[in-house]
Amino acid sequence: MSLPRHQDPIVAIATAPGRGAVGIVRVSGKSIGSLMQALLGRQLRAREATYLPFLDRSQLAIDQGIALYFPAPHSFTGEDVLELQAHGGPVVLQLLLARCLEAGAELDPVSQMPRLVGLRPALPGEFSERAFLNDKIDLAQAEAIADLIDASTEAAARSASRSLSGAFSQEIHILREALIHLRMLVEATLDFPEEEIDFLRQADARGQLSDLQQSLQSVLQKASQGALLREGITVVIAGQPNVGKSSLLNALAGAELAIVTPIAGTTRDKVQQTIQIEGVPVHVIDTAGLRDSDDVIEKIGIARTWDVIEAADAVLFLHDLTRKNATDYIAADAVIAEAIAGKLSASVPVIEIWNKADVIDRPCQQAGLQLSAKTGAGLDTLRRKLLELVGWQSKPEGVYMARERHVQALHRTAAHLMTAGFHLEAKAQALDLLAEELRLAQNALGEITGDFSSDDLLGVIFSRFCIGK
């Protein structure tokens, strides 16, 4: 799994671009003592913060700050790591980065060899990749680092921190250990068919498989909740012109984002805003009103409306209570409803909403949720309904931050275990097929933590990190 580039020493600015009080330049590699001497004029004691000048080639100070040295293997990457904490100006940090690269290429006065052969700028995520390759963290923990940085809600940050601490990985490890034990029983039965010992019956293989499936479902439920916290849901507001779609977006967002006028066709293109409901990011999209139109620009907007509807996790089909008895309005709504149903899979919920409840004198018996985007009446009910339909349990305390690939791997594991159960229950047990399904289930779990991963998968994952992590 290790590539030639993984042997190179690397350096990068580890703090976000822009001005700040403190900026960090991080170096990782093997035997960085000579580089330390060139940059700092001395060797550092391990894991001890030292305040001193950072020197250029002429031994003049570029800046003064704190230096920290973490010798291998007791560092984030598992290699020797040097961190320079300087003032956070972009020019200062670029000078320090350039000085590190320059010093790495300089000849050591004693050995007459470059101080740090091959020192180069780090690729995005390369420090975390080194930590993974050197068994300091597993793949799920590495991804949790990026998720913690990108967290947009408190619930997302806490669940990412939980995954980074190893809680999610520990659950996967327990599942894999149970799978390995079950595989051992099946392999023993296959390898010693002449023995008069029924390994599977004696060890209650059926019971073990059932327990494993139940544990897997518990982990899958928590991971699915974590995926909601990370990915959020995309909700599209759709309906005829002038039913209050833009007003509903503004009401949900608590801000005047979309233009609202009595003129039909005001919204020509989608308007998107991300809001939070119980810590879940909800990406709400206001769209052009659906109708037949001869206006070229409006027709483009309507086409885009159908595009976003097809990609939605949920659709809010908005109606106008004040026109509920108008024949032409009802007919147009029926056409739209049929078209929406044809665009979506059965798993995508469509919430029927009747707006302008504030205009109606008395309660209406119309089916669906009634609200007023103008007064806010009914919005809390809509928020709860949305989370309920996408499966949110409102208990983020035990949730792990998970990605869609984690959830899919868990689903594949469940499918393999189900097939394994069929083979186990069959009158003529196909033990070789049972063993294969258990092996595939174990591999699927291994993809989550990196125990079973291709180099291509690793490349995609770490390339999405920021530089310096």
From Swiss-Prot:
Subunit structure of this chain's protein: Homodimer. Heterotetramer of two MnmE and two MnmG subunits.
Taxonomic placement: Bacteria, Pseudomonadati, Pseudomonadota, Betaproteobacteria, Burkholderiales
Gene name, Swiss-Prot/TrEMBL: mnmE
Protein's organism: Albidiferax ferrireducens (strain ATCC BAA-621 / DSM 15236 / T118)
Name of the protein: tRNA modification GTPase MnmE
Alphabetical UniProt keywords: Cytoplasm, GTP-binding, Hydrolase, Magnesium, Metal-binding, Nucleotide-binding, Potassium, tRNA processing
Co-factor binding details: Binds 1 potassium ion per subunit.
Molecular function terms, GO-annotated: GTP binding; GTPase activity; metal ion binding
Annotated positions binding K(+): N242, T261, I263, T266
One cellular component (GO) term of this entry: cytosol
Function: Exhibits a very high intrinsic GTPase hydrolysis rate. Involved in the addition of a carboxymethylaminomethyl (cmnm) group at the wobble position (U34) of certain tRNAs, forming tRNA-cmnm(5)s(2)U34.
Cofactor(s) the protein requires to work: K(+)
Binding-site residues, Mg(2+): S246, T267
UniProt cross-references to PANTHER family, sorted A to Z: TRNA MODIFICATION GTPASE GTPBP3 (PTHR42714), TRNA MODIFICATION GTPASE GTPBP3, MITOCHONDRIAL (PTHR42714:SF2)
GO BP, one annotated term: tRNA methylation
InterPro entries from the UniProt entry: G_TrmE, GTP-bd, GTP-bd_TrmE_N, GTPase_MnmE, MnmE_dom2, MnmE_helical, P-loop_NTPase, Small_GTP-bd
